[in-house]
């Protein structure tokens, strides 16, 4: 018998995750949990005596939920984890804050260095987790430290150095939930910041299928290469499996054309990896996370 910890937040059983993801595919979460605050989350983790499997969920922008759904508990940090505040010449930002919202906040307050976030879908926590980057900047360039909690309910702090940022990854422990991120502040000019953000938005809209059901870059760029060029060279621009295809506009983006399953998307990605390796000898690595069970 499944016994859930007593919490102040909200549980939902057999919860459909499809509508929360940008791809609009996937199965259900066995248990979906939105904690009220960090203490509520800590209480849940300490009480999790059955050691229910735990997955965290952000904005759903860079993830494929498999069609068989997710066993155990999916934890989503809500609005109570999205605050932005100034403390001692630093920005303290809740991990569920959207990258776009932080970029707009910084522009309004003449804080430079965050312009690139306007072009990165997802949350601050997710951005740290994958060292997201675009247009010449990455999270490693602006993060001072993070505050997190492990699955045993211990609050932990990691400095930039301890995070161990790498290209689209880091050295953080796996069983960790990021709660807050501390950023350094560099003052700038609001008008110049806005101009740069507009440049980034214009570049995105002209080169990426931002109005489609997509999950951002499918594969990380291998050293010395650009994934889209390798995919294009292999003749896979627009290639389709079921309801999923590689974008004609930017062939490192996968698209749900309306009736794709998670299996279609994952099969397409694996096929592209195979063909690129056969064509160029380069092994593409997934940038999009794939989690959950196969049906």
Curated annotation (Swiss-Prot):
The active site is at 168, 217 (proton donor), 287. One of its GO terms (cellular component) is cytosol. Residues 24-188 form the FAD-binding PCMH-type domain. Its cofactor is FAD. Transmembrane segments: none annotated. Keywords: Cell cycle, Cell division, Cell shape, Cell wall biogenesis/degradation, Cytoplasm, FAD, Flavoprotein, NADP, Oxidoreductase, Peptidoglycan synthesis. Disulfide bonds: none annotated. Pathway: Cell wall biogenesis; peptidoglycan biosynthesis. GO terms for biological process: cell division; cell wall organization; peptidoglycan biosynthetic process; regulation of cell shape. Belongs to the MurB family. HAMAP family: MurB (MF_00037). Cell wall formation. This is UDP-N-acetylenolpyruvoylglucosamine reductase. It comes from Rickettsia peacockii (strain Rustic).
């Amino acid at each position: 018998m499944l016994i859930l910890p007593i919490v102040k937040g909200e549980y939902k059983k057999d919860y459909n995750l499809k509508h929360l993801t940008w791809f609009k595919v996937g199965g259900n979460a066995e248990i979906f949990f939105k904690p009220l605050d960090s203490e509520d989350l800590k209480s849940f983790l300490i009480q999790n005596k059955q050691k229910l499997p735990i997955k965290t969920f952000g904005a759903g922008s860079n993830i494929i939920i498999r069609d068989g759904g997710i066993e155990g508990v999916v934890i989503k940090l809500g609005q109570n984890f999205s605050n932005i505040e100034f403390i001692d010449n630093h920005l303290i930002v809740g991990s569920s804050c959207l990258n776009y919202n932080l970029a707009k906040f910084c522009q309004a307050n003449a804080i430079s260095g965050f312009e690139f976030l306007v072009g990165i879908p997802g949350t601050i926590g997710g951005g740290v987790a994958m060292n997201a980057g675009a247009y010449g900047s990455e999270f490693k360039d602006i993060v001072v430290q993070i505050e997190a909690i492990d699955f045993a309910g211990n609050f932990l702090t990691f400095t930039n150095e301890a995070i161990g940022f790498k290209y689209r990854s880091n050295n953080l422990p796996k069983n960790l939930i990021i709660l807050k991120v501390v950023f350094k502040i560099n003052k700038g000019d609001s008008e110049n910041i806005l101009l740069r953000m507009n440049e980034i938005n214009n570049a995105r809209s002209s080169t990426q299928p931002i109005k489609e059901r997509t999950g951002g870059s499918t594969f990380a760029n291998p050293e010395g290469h650009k994934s889209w060029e390798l995919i294009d060279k292999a003749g896979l621009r627009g290639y389709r499996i079921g309801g999923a295809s590689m974008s004609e506009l930017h062939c490192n983006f996968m698209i749900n054309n309306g009736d794709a399953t998670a299996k279609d998307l994952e099969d397409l990605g694996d096929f592209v990896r195979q063909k690129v390796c056969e064509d160029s000898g380069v092994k593409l690595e997934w940038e999009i996370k794939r989690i959950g069970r196969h049906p």
